[in-house]
UniProtKB/Swiss-Prot annotation:
This is Protein BASIC PENTACYSTEINE2. Belongs to the BBR/BPC family. Expressed in seedlings, leaves and pistils. Detected in the base of flowers and tips of carpels, in sepal and petal vasculature, in pollen grains, in young rosette, in the lateral and tip of primary roots, and in ovule at the exception of the outer integument. GO terms for molecular function: cis-regulatory region sequence-specific DNA binding; DNA binding; DNA-binding transcription factor activity; sequence-specific double-stranded DNA binding. Residues 152-161 have a biased composition (Low complexity). It comes from the Eukaryota. Transcriptional regulator that specifically binds to GA-rich elements (GAGA-repeats) present in regulatory sequences of genes involved in developmental processes. It holds the Pfam family GAGA_bind. Keywords: DNA-binding, Nucleus, Transcription, Transcription regulation. It is found in: Nucleus.
Length: 279
């Protein structure tokens, strides 16, 4: 029993043992004396279950139980008073009705209360929906690759095995003194201004450029430019038209074109000195 004289719900005693000393009394006084609220005076958050263990429950909202006592009074006034041993099986639903009543009230409160969602929770839910929508979006199907033809693979293998042949040089025909002459087969001209023959560079379309002399300098290699990084001072130049005139002069003198032509004395006196990158 509790300090208030209320029996624990976890234990059950027969009706005869409970009302043993009250057989000669009226039933009305015992019920009024033992009538207590359905929730005991202790902490309502701790409730004892049928196995004797305490279960944590949410605290119920305060409600008035006067209407329940009024119905009980009407019910017990209708019962006959007997001196014989009464049947208390119908009068002891209190131990079982209190938990069921509390469960019904708890369920009723859950259905009636509609919790209001905060704005932050609503924003979080909308963000989750957006992320789920992005994640659930089906990716674009990749286009299937076309199967490679075996014939093309065989052709590629055959091409790799065959040595590449350099394309033939284009013939550059010039009419020298009425005679057509292919200058693409001529040896590369040289310049001997430094005392040693130095091959000239090709310049433009059919022209040549000196690698060792300018209008003021005669040295090999030419010095680097102080104004542009990675560039050398360019040598004197000769266009295709000027080179044709040189060939006409040498052909009239009977020069053997099997030997390289020395352009030392054939450079233009007004040669330009541009900056070019020589690799």
């Amino acid at each position: 029993m509790d300090d208030d004289g209320f029996r624990n719900w976890g234990y059950y005693e027969p009706a005869a043992a409970t009302f043993k000393g009250n057989l000669g009394l009226q039933l009305m006084s015992t019920i009024d004396r033992n009538t207590k609220p359905f929730l005991p005076g202790r902490d309502p958050n701790l409730m004892m279950g049928p196995n004797g263990s305490y279960h944590h429950q949410e605290p119920p909202i305060h409600m008035s139980y006067n209407w329940i006592n009024q119905q009980k009074d009407k019910f017990f006034n209708m019962l006959p008073v007997t001196t014989a041993t009464p049947n208390y099986g119908n009068v002891l639903p209190e131990t079982s009705s209190a938990p069921s009543m509390q469960m019904n009230l708890h369920h009723h409160l859950q259905t009636e209360e509609n919790p209001v969602k905060l704005e932050e929770e609503i924003v979080v839910q909308t963000k989750k929906r957006k992320t789920n929508a992005k994640a659930g979006s089906t990716p674009k199907a990749k286009k299937p690759r076309k199967p490679k033809d075996e014939n093309s693979n065989n052709n590629n293998n055959n091409n790799t095995n065959v040595t590449r042949v350099k394309p033939a040089k284009k013939s550059v025909d010039l009419v020298i003194n009425g005679v057509s002459m292919d200058i693409s087969g001529l040896p590369v001209p040289i310049c001997t201004c430094t005392g040693a023959p130095q091959q000239c560079y090709r310049w433009g379309c059919g022209g040549w450029q000196s690698a060792c002399c300018t209008t003021n300098i005669s040295m090999h290699p030419l010095p680097m430019s102080t104004k542009r990084r990675g560039a050398r001072i360019s040598g004197r130049k000769m266009s295709q038209g000027a080179f044709k005139k040189v060939l006409e002069k040498l052909a009239s003198d009977g020069f053997n074109f099997g030997n390289p032509i020395d352009l030392k004395s054939h450079w233009a006196r007004h040669g330009t000195n541009k900056f070019v990158t020589i690799r």
